[in-house]
Amino acid sequence: SPDVYQCMTYIRNHTNEPISVEAAAAHTGRSASYMMKHFKGELGIRMGAYIMRCKLEEAKSLLTYSEKSLAEISSYLCFSSQSYFQNVFKKQYGITPLQYRKQTKGRSN
């Protein structure tokens, strides 16, 4: 639906801000409960999980194409702490951010 697409676009374009489900929903002019229901129904993923996925995808890009430190990346993407960022990244991808950086740097050389 246009509302879900607009919400997804807003989330992808604001990964470097502390995005909440409420803020993303408000951007569409809909209530958080309305957007959560439709988001999950259409995409099969909760909005909060999608927000985290987008932040982690941006982190992967920064790890690959920038020299930013983990502290800079976690701060830029508005994680509450570097250790939280590292834990969430490892839980999602099975490796630490530094291991990911080493792997991707090795492939590009």
Where are these regions (language model features)?
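Cytosolic nucleotide-utilizing catalytic cores of signal-transduction proteins
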Residues: 1-9, 13-36
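Terminal helix-turn-helix DNA-binding modules in bacterial transcription factors
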Residues: 8-9, 13, 18-22, 41-86, ...
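Core residues of bacterial helix-turn-helix
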Residues: 27-28, 77-78, 89
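Key DNA-contact positions within bacterial/archaeal DNA-binding proteins
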Residues: 33, 83, 98
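Non-catalytic C-terminal interaction regions
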Residues: 91-94, 100-103
